[in-house]
């Protein structure tokens, strides 16, 4: 089973296209969510999807001090990050690196979320907010979390 949080980065590296293509042997939990017509059933599927064997996503900022910062309005994208998913794979562009945790959070508030708000307004007809924050300082479960840091601009 594989699922993913909504992340511009995953679209830019064509992972979403690959997942939607069906040219693999993966059970795509995110596709099941999008197919569901009823909101209550969608919410149940979203809760199940964060416990997938593999969950892919991105982060909004990376502090040179080691913290990974992810934020979204409802928490549905970042819920898998702290514990729920068996394996977490995060992909991020190098432009997300900041000098400190404080600067990383500032980056999210002042740069990332105005862009995300505009994207959400266009995509869903309503804006976004910095509702739920996840800060990963260290992973205590060996080999659970993988950060793929790409030396180019991915996402925002």
Role assignments for model-derived ranges:
Residues 1-56:
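N-terminal active-site beta-alpha-beta segment that forms phosphate/nucleotide-binding
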Residues 48-156:
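Conserved phosphate- and dinucleotide-binding cores of soluble alpha/beta proteins
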């Amino acid at each position: 089973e594989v699922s993913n949080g909504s992340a511009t980065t995953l679209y830019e590296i064509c992972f979403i296209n690959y997942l939607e293509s069906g040219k693999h042997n993966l059970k795509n939990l995110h596709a099941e969510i999008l197919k569901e017509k009823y909101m209550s059933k969608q919410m149940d599927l979203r809760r199940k999807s964060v416990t997938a064997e593999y969950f892919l996503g991105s982060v909004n900022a990376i502090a040179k001090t080691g913290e990974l910062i992810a934020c979204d309005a409802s928490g549905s994208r970042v819920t898998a990050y702290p514990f729920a998913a068996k394996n977490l794979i995060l992909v991020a562009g190098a432009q997300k690196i900041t000098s400190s945790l404080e600067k990383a959070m500032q980056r999210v508030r002042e740069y990332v979320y105005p862009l995300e708000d505009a994207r959400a307004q266009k995509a869903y007809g309503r804006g976004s907010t910095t509702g739920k924050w996840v800060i990963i300082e260290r992973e205590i479960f060996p080999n659970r979390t993988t950060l793929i840091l790409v030396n180019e601009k991915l996402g925002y």
